């Protein structure tokens, strides 16, 4: 390679300097090239992960709307009220009623929504009638009022009722006075006697009476009227069409002695049942009308004597379950009664396990020691 020495460049530089001085303008600085910029280092970028294809979303399953079955609150033929679940807004009232021969005829059971009939002792039965304030009509007289038994208290506990009675067996009184499941109203106690009256037309103890007004007053005094309980009451249906009805009746049943029967006969005019006592019409003392109900339930309940009881009292197993017969629409159906614990309400179930529905109107419940004591006729 050939090189140029500095002596040959000197004349050229001198000439350039003279030319700049003669121009009269400031010298423009020679632009200096910017230093080369290095390219940024490449940064490795992670490749995007392949996106997974979302699983297809299942179409929402339509939830069927449950069918609401109406629960009628009154008999369409007679207008008699029904103790229907969902309509109970006040505490029910239960009254123990005498069924000794000297107590005939009784008063006020024709106004009850539900009546229980069970053995007391020596073949004599006792009633427990349910009145529902705001549902059942007023009863100006109810009675004769008698004493309680343990199994009646167990039934009463399932209704959380104001429970009116006149004394009772030691076992029944002990539970009635100790449980918080009922409001106890004993006519033989000082705090209860003001709501009852003795009639001069009969001899004691078959002459003690009360009324729905007096019992409501007792409930008010105890601040025990409101009781909105969705579990109270029974399920009802409309009457079967006339073409589907029959005339089958629980014509006769007895508790101990066959010669002392009670029973019912089917009434096609009301699609209900008329009560018989020893084969003749059983009537209300005040109205003179034959006792009537829309539904009859006959349940089998095991019983046994209470050891050492000098009054011949018995115990009945009303906690648990057992067979029963239901009569309505002139037909007979096999059902099962269930009351799993003392505080639980008494319920009845069909063979398919569904809770039984009754015809709207009164219900009469009979507790027999054996269904063999029941005679059914058409």
Which residue ranges define each predicted feature?
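Bacterial N-terminal signal peptides that target proteins for export
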Residues: 2-10
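Short linear sequence elements within intrinsically disordered, low-complexity coil regions
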Residues: 9, 43, 56-57, 239, ...
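Ser/Thr-rich, Proline-interspersed low-complexity disordered segments
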Residues: 14, 24-80, 85
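C-terminal motif of bacterial Sec signal peptides marking the signal peptidase cleavage site
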Residues: 18-21
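A surface/extracellular/periplasmic glyco- and lipid-processing/surface-interacting theme
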Residues: 71-116, 121-378
């Amino acid at each position: 390679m050939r090189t140029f020495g500095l002596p040959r460049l000197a004349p050229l530089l001198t000439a350039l300097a003279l030319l700049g001085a003669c121009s009269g303008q400031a010298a423009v600085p020679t632009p200096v090239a910017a230093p080369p910029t290095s390219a940024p280092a490449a940064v490795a970028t992670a490749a995007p992960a392949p996106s997974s294809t979302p699983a297809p979303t299942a179409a929402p399953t339509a939830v069927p709307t449950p069918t609401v079955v109406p629960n009628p609150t009154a008999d369409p033929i007679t207008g008699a009220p029904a103790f229907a679940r969902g309509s109970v807004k006040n505490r029910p009232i239960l009254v123990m009623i005498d069924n000794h021969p000297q107590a005939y005829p009784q008063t006020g059971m024709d106004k009850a929504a539900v009546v229980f009939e069970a053995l007391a002792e020596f073949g004599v039965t006792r009633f427990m009638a349910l009145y529902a304030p705001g549902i059942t009509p007023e009863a100006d007289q109810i009675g004769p009022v008698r004493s309680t038994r343990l199994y009646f208290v167990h039934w009463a506990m399932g209704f959380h009722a104001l429970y009116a009675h006149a004394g009772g067996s030691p076992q029944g009184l002990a539970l009635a006075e100790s449980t918080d499941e009922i409001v106890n109203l004993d006519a033989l106690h000082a705090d209860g006697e003001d709501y009852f009256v003795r009639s001069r037309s009969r001899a004691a103890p078959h002459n003690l009476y009360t009324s729905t007004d007096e019992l409501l007053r007792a409930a008010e005094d105890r601040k025990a009227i409101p009781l909105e309980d969705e579990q109270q009451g029974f399920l009802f249906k409309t009457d079967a069409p006339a073409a589907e009805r029959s005339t089958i009746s629980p014509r006769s049943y007895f508790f101990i002695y066959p010669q002392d029967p009670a029973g019912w006969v089917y009434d096609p005019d009301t699609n209900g049942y008329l009560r018989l006592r020893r084969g003749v019409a059983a009537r209300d003392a005040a109205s003179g009308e034959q006792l009537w109900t829309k539904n009859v339930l006959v349940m089998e309940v095991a019983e046994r004597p209470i050891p050492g009881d000098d009054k011949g009292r018995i115990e009945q197993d009303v906690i648990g379950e057992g067979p029963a017969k239901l009569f309505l629409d002139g037909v007979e159906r096999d059902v099962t009664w269930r009351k799993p614990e003392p505080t639980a309400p008494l319920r009845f179930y069909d063979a398919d396990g569904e809770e039984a529905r009754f015809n709207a109107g009164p219900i009469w419940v009979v507790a027999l020691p054996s269904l063999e004591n029941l005679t059914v006729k058409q």
